[in-house]
Amino acid sequence: MDPVGLQLGNKNLWSCLVRLLTKDPEWLNAKMKFFLPNTDLDSRNETLDPEQRVILQLNKLHVQGSDTWQSFIHCVCMQLEVPLDLEVLLLSTFGYDDGFTSQLGAEGKSQPESQLHHGLKRPHQSCGSSPRRKQCKKQQLELAKKYLQLLRTSAQQRYRSQIPGSGQPHAFHQVYVPPILRRATASLDTPEGAIMGDVKVEDGADVSISDLFNTRVNKGPRVTVLLGKAGMGKTTLAHRLCQKWAEGHLNCFQALFLFEFRQLNLITRFLTPSELLFDLYLSPESDHDTVFQYLEKNADQVLLIFDGLDEALQPMGPDGPGPVLTLFSHLCNGTLLPGCRVMATSRPGKLPACLPAEAAMVHMLGFDGPRVEEYVNHFFSAQPSREGALVELQTNGRLRSLCAVPALCQVACLCLHHLLPDHAPGQSVALLPNMTQLYMQMVLALSPPGHLPTSSLLDLGEVALRGLETGKVIFYAKDIAPPLIAFGATHSLLTSFCVCTGPGHQQTGYAFTHLSLQEFLAALHLMASPKVNKDTLTQYVTLHSRWVQRTKARLGLSDHLPTFLAGLASCTCRPFLSHLAQGNEDCVGAKQAAVVQVLKKLATRKLTGPKVVELCHCVDETQEPELASLTAQSLPYQLPFHNFPLTCTDLATLTNILEHREAPIHLDFDGCPLEPHCPEALVGCGQIENLSFKSRKCGDAFAEALSRSLPTMGRLQMLGLAGSKITARGISHLVKALPLCPQLKEVSFRDNQLSDQVVLNIVEVLPHLPRLRKLDLSSNSICVSTLLCLARVAVTCPTVRMLQAREADLIFLLSPPTETTAELQRAPDLQESDGQRKGAQSRSLTLRLQKCQLQVHDAEALIALLQEGPHLEEVDLSGNQLEDEGCRLMAEAASQLHIARKLDLSNNGLSVAGVHCVLRAVSACWTLAELHISLQHKTVIFMFAQEPEEQKGPQERAAFLDSLMLQMPSELPLSSRRMRLTHCGLQEKHLEQLCKALGGSCHLGHLHLDFSGNALGDEGAARLAQLLPGLGALQSLNLSENGLSLDAVLGLVRCFSTLQWLFRLDISFESQHILLRGDKTSRDMWATGSLPDFPAAAKFLGFRQRCIPRSLCLSECPLEPPSLTRLCATLKDCPGPLELQLSCEFLSDQSLETLLDCLPQLPQLSLLQLSQTGLSPKSPFLLANTLSLCPRVKKVDLRSLHHATLHFRSNEEEEGVCCGRFTGCSLSQEHVESLCWLLSKCKDLSQVDLSANLLGDSGLRCLLECLPQVPISGLLDLSHNSISQESALYLLETLPSCPRVREASVNLGSEQSFRIHFSREDQAGKTLRLSECSFRPEHVSRLATGLSKSLQLTELTLTQCCLGQKQLAILLSLVGRPAGLFSLRVQEPWADRARVLSLLEVCAQASGSVTEISISETQQQLCVQLEFPRQEENPEAVALRLAHCDLGAHHSLLVGQLMETCARLQQLSLSQVNLCEDDDASSLLLQSLLLSLSELKTFRLTSSCVSTEGLAHLASGLGHCHHLEELDLSNNQFDEEGTKALMRALEGKWMLKRLDLSHLLLNSSTLALLTHRLSQMTCLQSLRLNRNSIGDVGCCHLSEALRAATSLEELDLSHNQIGDAGVQHLATILPGLPELRKIDLSGNSISSAGGVQLAESLVLCRRLEELMLGCNALGDPTALGLAQELPQHLRVLHLPFSHLGPGGALSLAQALDGSPHLEEISLAENNLAGGVLRFCMELPLLRQIDLVSCKIDNQTAKLLTSSFTSCPALEVILLSWNLLGDEAAAELAQVLPQMGRLKRVDLEKNQITALGAWLLAEGLAQGSSIQVIRLWNNPIPCDMAQHLKSQEPRLDFAFFDNQPQAPWGT
């Protein structure tokens, strides 16, 4: 027994343990490596006896402390076959703290370190603690070599039998397959590169381990960063490098050191390089300084590897980086150990800024298919299950995609190794569907068969979760209970290593074998532990963004935790979790449901690309189809992925989710590092419609993988592969794959640096892609010869419609033929031939070869090529090197190339000499519409028009029309040709040659010339004026910016005499804008046949042309008297009519006088306009004087002293009235007399407008005094002149002195109007309207005085003048006149609140006799008519009548006053009053009043509220009014009793002439009363009973009652139900009514039978003037009957909606033709289709014609509109809701100028287009008096309608009728 055994106190137990372990020395060695990672198991121990070696190893374990010893004992009991009695003794003795003696613990701790870590860690002192010893060079070299050998030996010992992962199965240790490595093309020289690792990675160039380091001195970067996602094998590769170096493969390095940041993070102090190497790795046996000096001197042969750079702790405060990161930074930058090589491994993320910009970046991309197969072969080498494993991987696509991650591939192999012997082939699909179940099966595989240690798993999971939450990945023995350490070691869940934080500070650390395993165990704990509730659980289900640089500085440790939680939420995992949860299946189910619910919420949110990928992983792990479907459907149509790495597993997961989606999706991968085999994951994804990749990482291998996937994507329409490194090899794969994708519509290979031949290879597939619309080959530099080859492809390929090449751009646009699916499936050769045949028939090609360095010989080749090709839409060769010859060749070829739209030769070096050649070359080109050449701007553009035979189809013409109208009037129709030679430096010497070259163009169409921006000067302008007649009829000539003087400009005015085509000359002198134009409508829009040929439109435009005046517009020009004199002298010979428009900054009085003096010399002048011209205050008087001096002036309009217009009569017009407008001219009182004196010299002034001046009250007073001298016969407008009530009262006082004033109106409110209307003769009666005058009480007496003196004033209206009831009563009492009638109308807000009683009380105060009273509460109006002098009533008679009134004292007094005042009352009107609100007191008073009104002739009570009792009172009063001639009770709703009372009141009313009972409900009893009373009314002239519910029986009785009414003139029975029977009775009596003038039977259900009888009767009504029979089914028979003999005095005929046809309507029209009295006709809503409604003879009085909704078409409208000229009085034409088109509009536009009284035309809901509307606008412009033409709901685009309305406001396109005011002066 050794001493230790003796001290244990149980020698027998120790011996048993030694004997047990001696049987399995390999197991003990493995445990020694686990618990003592740096233990040296060298050959020196092999000489010992096996039992002694075991004792030595146990001693080493024992001295580590109780935790290690207890963990070891637990491992012994778990893993070895220990007898039960021995296991109990071992656990009871050593398995707990009390079994470990403190003495031995102390003894173990006191042993020297060399015994603890023999062979690896030698005791040493720090580098700085020993004095420097002098050694010779040889000794230094020996020491260094000894250390280097020690370093290599220690590495050999470490990797002798395994790679990292101690305790794992043997198979794990032997398998190593290098992953795919790709080197980045650029280093970290940008912040983006530092963040992500540069995404521009070479594809297809794998990097081997030996290639990672460039050993050439001073060549390449010294720092290498290895980037790879979790599980890619970064740590494994780092240890592999150490192993390779230990085996002598990396001879370029003498020393290699490997550090892990997870351990370095534990260092809290700053380290020197020697401390890093010797204290934390391996210390020399002696003389550390000498060894370090050697390493420093040979640093270029030293390799430092840092694993887990992403785990480096970033600085948290302002103190800078941590100690280890600082040291790492200095090593990378070369400030420490300069020249050494540094390699760091990291996950993609935000890397520290300390990395140098030139650091080499290498990406680890995991396994591709061959590597997975190789790994499986190695793993299962020499095992019978190898083939089975390969089969499983081949059949299980999901498992195969998971194996792209090397760590998962290792786990998958372990699971297959466990599953294959016990399961049938193909079970992996069910057992290993995702990553979570891989780990679950791994746990089951590592567990003892049939036994799952649930508590240990959950406890270890709790440790894992605690580590994730605290950021801890290294655990010590104190952190994990010994049984858990033993459990982790036994099941290969934990790995151990030596943690050295300084000299002498070393201890064993534990970590989970992989971070993902730690996350999986944490997820197990969360899902199965009873300590965790579901609310806590859901907090861990989050999505982590991979854009780490934007969110956090360090990658999280729980990135996969949500994925594992989602995977454990799968139903498949429930039995496993329930077992872990001790059978608590309900709790597990609730947690699973909670996880799924969180994922459902996340699925419906808008997520970034990285989170979408994370979500897809989580959803895919759940294996829930419903959740997958929800996620797939919630993904956006455009799904972008930008600037974050994606693996093949990511894309495979995305594909799995998309399988649950129905709608197509667009995937865009921009800047995402992708593995070369990534596209394989998209195989069979039928939901992808657009697929786009943009990454330098994509190369040939990527393209090859993509070519295999593309044919399987059935919906793919767009493929983009931009910015890649694809070569010819990769493109060849894609070219072979593209024809297998016939559904592709767009393909992009932008920015791929493709060669010429590769580009040509690509375009070869164009005929094989029948639906392709776009091919983008931009940013792939090609030569000119290749470009011409591509042009040939564009010409020959039948589907290409555009080739666009400009510098880097190269794009094909195609128009695939419309083909069915069956056609697409036919043989390719048949498709190609069909396509060529169709293309030859209809294709047009656009060719844009801009800035392509084309020369003259290239142009020749291109012309030859294009002549063989299809029609060309556009050819753009701008920016090349064609020069004069090349441009000439292209211009000559233009007519042969059939270019439809544009030829652009800009920026091709054209000279002035070349301009002439080009002009001659295009002279014979019939289709040229415009040529624009500007040598200064290097512009040469040819615009072409379609040939006439190519313009087919009405739809094309309509589309052309709309486009034309949108351009009017500034743009040109296709029939014109415009030649623009601008900024070409042309001088006078060039003109003759130019005009010769232009001669051929002048005869091809209407020519527009533009010579602006040249250098013609005065000589050139004069010479051009001589040459212009030789050029024929131009449409316009632009001479702007040619340096002309004022003399030359005025000289151009002579062209009016020499050029017949010149209609308008616009000159802006200062800006040198000079434009000569013809008539804009004489461009002959129908010349080419491109527009419909309307004879009416052509005739109308011809008429317009004859009437259009010539116009000279001269602006920005100094208008001095000499210039004006010369100008007028030049204009003498100008043919007329002439409009002269002048504009300058200021026009002096002398210049204005000169201009006005010259007016008599210009008899052809029709308009003189001074716009935007400053005029002096004297100008109003100068202009006013012209009204008398120049008889041709008919209107002067001066506004604001800046705008003046003079309108002149033509020579044919007779002298007539004139008008003057002087608004906003600052006229005040001092100017009034002078102005009135000048106006008094006029013969006849129809209107004078002095509004918006400064007259004030004093100026107005002065003006009113001068009024008698001014011969005004129309309107005087003085609005907006700052007047007050004083002026209103003065106007009243001056009315007696103004005999010709007929009406005056004053509004002092916001309207501020003051208008006086005159007549030519003295007016007997005058009307004055005063509104919002705010009269005060003191004004009432003055108002009354004025009214009393103005005896000719017969009517006064006071609207809202602040007169209360009291003031109104005073006014009525004060007004007194000698004799005559006077009406006062008051409208005040209080009138609607005042009762009838109070209003009658006001009337009682009148001084004259009240003859009429009218009260309307809702209109707030009281009207009183007074008669003077007042006739006093006999007091005794009044007292007698009062005695019979049952009224109170106050009411009796009021009745008495009324009886006196209203004794002569003849009319009492009450409208919309309420007689119920005062307990019938008003009706009682009215009863009393009616009893006294012996002269009352008219009583009206309409639309009012009266109680039954009140009606009885009124009926009683009315019963005594025996002289009543008119009774109106319409629009009331009385009950039957009240109605009967009123009917009884009609008894004895034999003098009644007019009776209106409309809307009263007349039942049989009330109607019987009425008919009985009617039979007594022999004087009745008008009876209105509309809407009284009268039937045929009632009509029969009514007819009998009317037999005696021989004086009846009007009968209105409309909208009853009399029917044919009632009409029959009525027809029998109508001939007996000889005075009948108006009958209205509309809406009475009369059919054609009744209508015929009625027509026969009406023929006998000789005096009939108005006949209204609408809304009855009369039909043509009735119309024919009426037409046989219409009454000769007929004025109004209304037959709307009468079921008339063309025959009936035409018969009526013929009967009405030439009717001298007809004023209105309505045939609306009848069918006139095919009928021609025409009037041949004049209808002199016809004012309105209504033909709404009569199905009138263009043909019918032609004759109808021609008839309108026979109706000189026509004011309203209603043609809405018909079928009128542009032809009808043209006809109407032709007659509009001839209709002087027409005010309104309704053309709503027709078929008029923009052309028709424009023609109507042109018709309005001819001086029509029309106020509005309504065009709502015609097929006119909104923008076009707005444009037309801006040009002509009287065109109304709105739904509501917004009629503008008529133009002033009409």
UniProtKB/Swiss-Prot annotation:
Protein name per Swiss-Prot or TrEMBL: Protein NLRC5
Tissue and organ distribution: Expressed in spleen, thymus, lung, brain, tonsil, heart and prostate.
SMART domains named among the record's database cross-references: LRR_CC, LRR_RI
Induction of synthesis: By IFNG/IFN-gamma.
LRR repeats: 599-622, 713-737, 741-765, 769-792, 869-892, 897-921, 930-953, 976-1000, 1004-1026, 1031-1058, 1138-1161, 1162-1184, 1242-1265, 1272-1294, 1462-1488, 1493-1516, 1521-1544, 1554-1577, 1578-1600, 1605-1628, 1633-1656, 1661-1684, 1687-1714, 1715-1739, 1741-1762, 1795-1818
Record: residues binding ATP: G228, K229, A230, G231, M232, G233, K234, T235
InterPro entries according to UniProt: Leu-rich_rpt, Leu-rich_rpt_Cys-con_subtyp, LRR_dom_sf, NACHT_NTPase, NLRC5_atypical_Card, NLRP_HD2, P-loop_NTPase
Principal place of residence: cytoplasm
Purpose of the protein: Probable regulator of the NF-kappa-B and type I interferon signaling pathways. May also regulate the type II interferon signaling pathway. Plays a role in homeostatic control of innate immunity and in antiviral defense mechanisms.
GO molecular function terms noted in the UniProt entry: ATP binding; RNA polymerase II cis-regulatory region sequence-specific DNA binding
Lineage, highest ranks first: Eukaryota, Metazoa, Chordata, Craniata, Vertebrata
GO biological process: defense response to virus; innate immune response; negative regulation of NF-kappaB transcription factor activity; negative regulation of type I interferon-mediated signaling pathway; positive regulation of MHC class I biosynthetic process; positive regulation of transcription by RNA polymerase II; positive regulation of type I interferon-mediated signaling pathway; positive regulation of type II interferon-mediated signaling pathway
Superkingdom assignment: Eukaryota
Keyword Repeat belongs to the record: yes
Residue intervals passing through the bilayer: none
Locations listed in the record: Cytoplasm
